[in-house]
Amino acid sequence: MNNLIVFGSPLIADRVPRKKFDELILFEKKEKYAERLRQLLPNAKVRNEDVNSPGFKAMAKARLEAGSVHFLAFVDPEGLEIEWETLQHLFDFTGDLIINYQSTGVSRSALKENKTSAEIETLQRFFGTDEWKACGNEDALFKLYLEKIRKHREVTIPIKVRSPYRFHYYMIVAVRKTRGSQRWVSVIEETKEKIEAIKPEDLENIIRRLSGGQVKLAV
């Protein structure tokens, strides 16, 4: 399965939607990855910059402050990279977010004994509070994070994704509540049920099938 190519979030955002986004703005702090994104998505605006930087906040304010621009932000950090202050900045504008919360990694860092001062500071920035210190397990940490998001977006739907490699993460869909029916929120709820019903071994079989290693899925 080493040669299997799987689309990441930027490519999915560009290739999958029937109705294309008006604009794609991508932040990637690693230069080699930013350059690769430019090659794969020549029409996207790729910025080789840390999303927690003042540059991101200035860009977001300039582009979104008027309130006439609706956006979907897909927040796909590595570990504890995304700071709560950055999310808070996005919540202040008119838009929806999908946030990848890496539950296993977060709990491993937060529940670790004898943390360094740098590790504690990273956790403080990630949660935006010291309340994480009172959390004794993985579920409590996730609940804290989820409740902080719900203070800014009434419609917040966590989707648990279980990996075949013995870890899991959550895709948190956080959207504004509007006066309309928001039929697509029901679609997200239905999708949540389907994704959470998938067993880790099913995912492994899917990967093998895509890579040509298995003829059919186990039932």
List the predicted regions and their residue ranges:
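Flexible, glycine-/basic-rich loop-and-beta segments that form/coincide
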Residues: 178-210
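A short SAM/SAH-binding and catalytic strip from SAM-dependent methyltransferases
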Residues: 69-81
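Short amphipathic alpha-helix with an adjacent loop that forms part of the alpha/beta core around
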Residues: 55-67, 88
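Residues at the starts of beta-strands that form the adenosine-phosphate
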Residues: 22-23, 70, 96
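SAM cofactor-binding core of SAM-dependent methyltransferases
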Residues: 1-59
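A short, conserved alpha-helix within the catalytic core of class I
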Residues: 79-92
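Conserved beta-strand signature within the Rossmann-like core of class I S-adenosyl-L-methionine
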Residues: 94-108
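A conserved mid-domain beta-alpha-beta active-site/ligand-binding segment of alpha/beta enzyme cores
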Residues: 109-175
